[in-house]
Every structure is written in structure tokens, then in C-alpha cells.
Amino acid sequence: MKKKANRLDAIKMIISSKEVGSQEELLQELNREGFELTQATLSRDLKQLKVAKAASMNGKYVYVLPNNIMYKRSTDQSAGEMLRNNGFISLQFSGNIAVIRTRPGYASSMAYDIDNNEFSEILGTIAGDDTIMLVLREGVATSKVRQLLSLIIPNIE
């Protein structure tokens, strides 16, 4: 069973960090990671993980994980690799407004995660394709907001 758990972890990691458009591409990536499996096994694994296909920014359909799964490996090197792929670019403050810049396509899901945490210090968010505007409660320290956001965006510093 451990072998299957490791394989599922590898699938989540690959899908989270690369644009994979077919089972054949995913099988090749898994082979590079040292996993030998058939297309039928991969198909069952994808079904178990509830993996779907969605259009990427370049119009190519790629595998994506369900919205609520955020996957991170535990080793420093691969965690750093994952942090570079979570979409966060920058955070700036002006008065009681914060602006988060993301890679294209990441803002909406990141705003969704912020809203679902129901931080009392953040009144609400508005998201576009690559920008999130947060309205902050009056008098909240930017350091507190940064600390709260670090629960969702680990590399926010």
C-alpha cells in the first residue's frame, strides 16, 4: 500500500508543478521518478484523486487537482520547487487595501482560499486573472495580515 501512496503523491506533485496534457506524458514523468505502471493503473489513480482536465493559459488542456488539494513535498529542495509554482508574485499595502499579484490564472483560486479562511482582519477580496484586492479592517497591522496570508501562501515572506 505504501507503494501506491508514494505513487499517488508523485502524481499530485507532477500535476501541481508541470503542465501535463495526457496520460502518456504523465506516465513518462512517473517513469523519470522511478515508478513503473500501466496506463490502466494510472487511469484508476487519476480517478481516485479526482483529477480533471482544464484549459491552461496557453489554451492547452492539462490535468489539474481538485480545488481543495494543495500538495507539498516535505524535503527542502522540492518544497522550494513547489513554492515557485504556487502562483504568488508580490504583496503590497496602501491604507486598508492590500494587493496581491499572481501568475495568470491563480488569483481567483487564491482569493477563494483567503475568503474561505474567514479572517476577521480581511473584510473581503476581489480577484481578476492575476491580481487580488483585499479590503482590510481599519487599524489592522500589515504584519498581521502578512502573517495570516502566510497560512495560505507559504512563500509570502
Swiss-Prot record:
Pfam families: Arg_repressor, Arg_repressor_C. One of its GO terms (cellular component) is cytoplasm. The keyword Magnesium does not apply. Signal peptide: none annotated. It is found in: Cytoplasm. Keywords: Amino-acid biosynthesis, Arginine biosynthesis, Cytoplasm, DNA-binding, Repressor, Transcription, Transcription regulation. Regulates arginine biosynthesis genes. Belongs to the ArgR family. This is Arginine repressor. It comes from Bacteroides thetaiotaomicron (strain ATCC 29148 / DSM 2079 / JCM 5827 / CCUG 10774 / NCTC 10582 / VPI-5482 / E50). The gene is argR.
